[in-house]
């Protein structure tokens, strides 16, 4: 199915670290012509610059950064280090920082008719009225292996134990934080990626949900 010009589709994709949400969200965005945004990269971008520049006032510093942020700046391999991952969970607890990034994401979503944003609080906080809310789940060992393969492209010395530990800490912090914790939206569609045979199976499941929604909304 090809979406028509008048079709409006807003998708939220949430889940823990390396659960498959980024891959799934990117692939269905490409398939259906959706504007894609990773909220995780926004937080990593914020962490990277706070650690690099150590500003006196984090909030005013980040406001300026996000007022001029282009999505091309998010394509930075250094954003994916374990150090950045750990720091990201720390700043994610800060409501003022979350508000800056929330405003950026909402503004992004309002610019387009067809949007997919992935993260950890998209379906519950950023896009609570999304047409479709996907929630990705994955066994921690499998998720850690996925992340290890990704990280070893730039850091051959990193180990499975390090990655798994960092991911466990990250997920626990995200679930337990006071502000916008990682929780499954009530009406979310579960995508259990470790139970699916391959990426094609994941895309097929998501596509079926999307096309059924479009047919209900606009007719066959």
Tell what function each PLM region has.
Residues 22:
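Walker A/P-loop
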Residues 17:
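The conserved Walker
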Residues 29-39, 52-55:
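Post-Walker A helix-loop "phosphate-sensing" segment adjacent to the P-loop in P-loop NTPases
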Residues 41-114, 121-125, 141, 145, ...:
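ATP-dependent small-molecule kinase phosphotransfer cores
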Residues 2-8:
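Phosphate-binding P-loop
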Residues 132, 184-201:
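Phosphate-binding beta-loop-alpha motif at adenosine-nucleotide cofactor sites
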Residues 11-13:
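Hydrophobic anchor at the beta1->P-loop junction of P-loop NTPases
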């Amino acid at each position: 199915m090809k979406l028509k010009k008048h079709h409006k589709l807003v998708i939220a994709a949430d889940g823990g670290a390396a659960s498959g949400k980024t891959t799934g969200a990117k692939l269905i965005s490409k398939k259906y012509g959706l504007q894609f945004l990773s909220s995780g990269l926004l937080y990593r971008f914020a962490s990277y610059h706070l650690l690099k520049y150590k500003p006196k006032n984090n909030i005013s510093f980040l406001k300026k950064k996000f007022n001029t942020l282009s999505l091309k700046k998010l394509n930075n391999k250094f954003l994916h280090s374990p150090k950045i991952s750990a720091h990201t969970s720390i700043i994610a607890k800060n409501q003022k920082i979350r508000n800056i990034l929330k405003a950026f994401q909402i503004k992004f979503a309002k610019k387009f008719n067809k949007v997919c944003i992935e993260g950890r609080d998209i379906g519950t906080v950023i896009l609570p009225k999304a047409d479709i809310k996907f929630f990705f789940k994955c066994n921690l060992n499998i998720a850690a292996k996925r992340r290890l393969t990704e990280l070893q492209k730039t850091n051959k010395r990193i180990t499975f134990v390090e990655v798994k530990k960092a991911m466990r800490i990250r997920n626990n912090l995200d679930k337990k934080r006071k502000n916008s914790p990682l929780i499954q939206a009530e009406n979310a569609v579960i995508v259990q990626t470790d139970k699916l045979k391959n990426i094609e199976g994941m895309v097929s499941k998501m596509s079926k949900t999307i096309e059924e929604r479009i047919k209900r909304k606009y007719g066959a």
